[in-house]
Amino acid sequence: GVIINVKCKISRQCLEPCKKAGMRFGKCMNGKCHCTPK
C-alpha cells in the first residue's frame, strides 16, 4: 500500500483520506493510513 501522512487509530478513519488521495481504501497500520491504489 501507499503510506499517506494521515494519523489514525482505526482503519475506518482512512477511508476518506485515501479516497481524497485518489485511491480506493485504506487501513490503519502503526498509526498511519496505508492506502490501496486503484
UniProtKB/Swiss-Prot annotation:
PROSITE patterns: SCORP_SHORT_TOXIN. GO terms for molecular function: ion channel inhibitor activity; potassium channel regulator activity; toxin activity. Has the structural arrangement of an alpha-helix connected to a beta-sheet by disulfide bonds (CSalpha/beta). This is Potassium channel toxin alpha-KTx 3.7. Belongs to the short scorpion toxin superfamily. Potassium channel inhibitor family. Alpha-KTx 03 subfamily. Blocks voltage-gated potassium channels Kv1.1/KCNA1 (IC(50)=0.6 nM), Kv1.2/KCNA2 (IC(50)=5.4 nM), Kv1.3/KCNA3 (IC(50)=0.014 nM) potently, and moderately block intermediate conductance calcium-activated potassium channels KCa3.1/KCNN4 (IC(50)=225 nM). Also shows activity on muscle-type nicotinic acetylcholine receptor (nAChR), since it reversibly and dose-dependently inhibits acetylcholine-induced current through mouse muscle-type nAChR heterologously expressed in Xenopus oocytes (IC(50)=1.6 uM). InterPro entries: Scorpion_toxin-like_sf (IPR036574), Scorpion_toxinS_K_inh (IPR001947). GO terms for cellular component: extracellular region. Negative results: does not show activity on Kv1.4/KCNA4, Kv1.5/KCNA5, Kv1.6/KCNA6, Kv1.7/KCNA7, Kv3.1/KCNC1, Kv11.x/KCNH, KCa1.1/KCNMA1, KCa2.1/KCNN1, KCa2.2/KCNN2, and KCa2.3/KCNN3. Does not show activity on Kv3.2/KCNC2. May not inhibit neuronal human alpha-7 nAChR, since it does not inhibit alpha-7 alpha-bungarotoxin binding (IC(50)~20 uM). Changing T36Y: Loss of activity. Pfam families: Toxin_2. Disulfide bonds join C8-C28, C14-C33, C18-C35. Expressed by the venom gland. It is found in: Secreted. Changing E16K: No change in activity. 1 to 2-fold increase in activity on Kv1.1/KCNA1, Kv1.2/KCNA2 and Kv1.3/KCNA3 without affecting activity on KCa3.1/KCNMA1. Loss of activity. Loss of activity.
